[in-house]
C-alpha cells in the first residue's frame, strides 16, 4: 500500500512541475513571431508554425522537421548553429504553411507529414489547444516589424 501512495505522490509532483513549464520558450516565440511576420502569415498560420515547432521538436538543424535526416543534402540543413538553423528551418516551414495550409489540418498533414498524416493532424490539434490555452488564446509578445534576416 505504501508503494502505491508513494508512486501516486511522485506522479502528482512531476505533473505539478511540468504544469508550470511553457511548451515553447519565450525566446523561440520571438523567433517564430518574426518568421511569421516576414512570411505574412495570419494568426492561425502563426499558431500552426508554433505547433509544428512543438510537434517536430528537433535538435539544431531539424527544429521544424524540414528536409528529412541530417546530411541528406536538403538546403534547410545549412547550419548547425541553433540560432541560424532555427530561422532557416522556420522559414522553410513558414513557406510550406503559407503556400499549402487552407484551414484543414488533415489535408495539410498529407503535405507536411505524408507518411503519417492522420496521426500528425491529431497530435497537432492537441498541441494547438495546449499552446492556445497556455497563452489565453493570444499569440505571445508584440508583433515585430518585418525585417530581413540574411545569413552567408
Where are these regions (language model features)?
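Sec/Tat signal peptide C-region and signal peptidase I cleavage site
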Residues: 15-20
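Bacterial N-terminal signal peptides
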Residues: 7-14
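Catalytic glycan-binding domains that act on GlcNAc-containing polysaccharides
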Residues: 21-151
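Positively charged n-region of N-terminal signal peptides that target proteins for export
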Residues: 1-4
